[in-house]
């Protein structure tokens, strides 16, 4: 039997002035042979929260962990159920090498807390208060976006019990379909003044309905926050192989940084190759100083007009100057036209 997660119900007051400041009620937990059972009572406020504030309150008696999906530097992600519905639960650990970075990652995940879009993994609920014996800095309950990432599909390693072949999954039509899903998600995020800043195949989930959903917002930033910090340099996380030159140089991020990352991702979908080899610091230097990019010389790009079109789209996305890259809206239009021309 899965075990309920023993955390409290509310985010702190500073997240929203509309939530009252009563102290958290941490339920008692008694061990049983089959797991843990909550003995504490539900705070009276929880059932009465309006829909627009529903994600501030979690009924932890309805949360049951099933198994771990993965782990990283900041914590672990589990498959679970919440009120009987499959969800993913991310726990951010306290004892990481960089506590402040893990705190930033947790709060960055909540940049999308109130957003709803078919191509964005939805935040269901979150909590920062934990029992004294817990190692968790915070917990986020998210929509379960799927068992498989785009990275796994590209490189042939999936968790699916009956994995489909990579070549079958990544025909040109499939690449364009997935690309449009991702660009639709980016267009929505940018319309909400949110930058993802770590877009890559490993952070794109593929649902059972074959829909791509952008996930892992631990590096995300709000545009207004970036503008406020313009006078002082600040750290932006992410994956160096997918980071735009201006990010590697420490400049202020814009939506065009996500477009650059999408260009690398589209190249991966098309070639099924790894973007770079070599030491990270040398790759970063070459990207900035020598305009290094993954190769577009393969037959997949040069042997047909279709390949040439893909080549042009990718090149436009990873232009050295951010202003020369298309925005998500123009990119969406070009991909739709390309897909339509293929019939």
UniProtKB/Swiss-Prot annotation:
Record-annotated Protein kinase domain positions: 63-339
Biological process per Gene Ontology, one example term: regulation of meiotic nuclear division
GO MF terms held by the record: ATP binding; MAP kinase kinase kinase activity; protein serine kinase activity; protein serine/threonine kinase activity
Enzyme Commission code: 2.7.11.1
Annotated catalytic residues: 198 (proton acceptor)
Record key words, sorted: ATP-binding, Cytoplasm, Kinase, Nucleotide-binding, Proto-oncogene, Serine/threonine-protein kinase, Transferase
GO-annotated cellular components: cytoplasm
Entry-linked Pfam families: Pkinase (PF00069)
Locations listed in the record: Cytoplasm
Catalytic activity reported: L-seryl-[protein] + ATP = O-phospho-L-seryl-[protein] + ADP + H(+); L-threonyl-[protein] + ATP = O-phospho-L-threonyl-[protein] + ADP + H(+)
Annotated ATP binding sites: 69-77, 90
Description of how the protein assembles with itself and partners: Interacts with MAP2K1/MEK1.
General function of this protein: Serine/threonine kinase involved in the regulation of MAPK signaling. Is an activator of the ERK1/2 signaling cascade playing an essential role in the stimulation of oocyte maturation.
Family: Belongs to the protein kinase superfamily. Ser/Thr protein kinase family.
PANTHER family listed in its UniProt record: SERINE/THREONINE-PROTEIN KINASE TNNI3K-RELATED, V-MOS MOLONEY MURINE SARCOMA VIRAL ONCO HOMOLOG
The name this protein goes by in its record: Proto-oncogene serine/threonine-protein kinase mos
Organism of provenance: Mus musculus
């Amino acid at each position: 039997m899965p075990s309920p997660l023993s955390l409290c119900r509310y985010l702190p007051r500073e997240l929203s002035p509309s939530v009252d400041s009563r102290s958290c009620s941490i339920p008692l937990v008694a061990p049983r042979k089959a797991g843990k059972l909550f003995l504490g009572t539900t705070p009276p406020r929880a059932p009465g929260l309006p829909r627009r504030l529903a994600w501030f309150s979690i009924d932890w008696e309805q949360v049951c962990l099933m198994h771990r999906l993965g782990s990283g530097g900041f914590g672990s992600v589990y498959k679970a159920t919440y009120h009987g519905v499959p969800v993913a639960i991310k726990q951010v650990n306290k004892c990481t090498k960089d506590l402040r970075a893990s705190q930033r990652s947790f709060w960055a995940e909540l940049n999308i807390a109130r957003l709803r879009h078919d191509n964005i993994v939805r935040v269901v609920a979150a909590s920062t208060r934990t029992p004294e014996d817990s190692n968790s800095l915070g917990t986020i309950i998210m929509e379960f976006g799927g068992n498989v990432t785009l990275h796994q599909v590209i490189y042939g390693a999936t968790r699916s019990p009956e994995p489909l072949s990579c070549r079958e999954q990544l025909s040109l039509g499939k690449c364009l379909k997935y690309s449009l899903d991702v660009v639709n998600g980016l267009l929505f995020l940018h319309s909400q003044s949110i930058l993802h800043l770590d877009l890559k195949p490993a952070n794109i989930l593929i649902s059972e309905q074959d829909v791509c959903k952008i996930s892992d917002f631990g590096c995300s930033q709000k545009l207004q926050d970036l503008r406020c910090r313009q006078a002082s340099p600040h750290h932006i996380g992410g994956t160096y192989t997918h980071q735009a030159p201006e990010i590697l140089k420490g400049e202020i991020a814009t939506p065009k940084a996500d477009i650059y990352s999408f260009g690398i991702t589209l190249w991966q979908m098309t070639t099924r190759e790894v973007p770079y080899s070599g030491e990270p610091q040398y790759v970063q230097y070459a990207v900035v100083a020598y305009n290094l990019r993954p190769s577009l010389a393969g037959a997949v790009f040069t042997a047909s007009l279709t390949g040439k079109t893909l080549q042009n789209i990718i090149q436009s996305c990873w232009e050295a100057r951010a202003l020369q890259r298309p925005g998500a809206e123009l990119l969406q239009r070009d991909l739709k036209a390309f897909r339509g021309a293929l019939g």
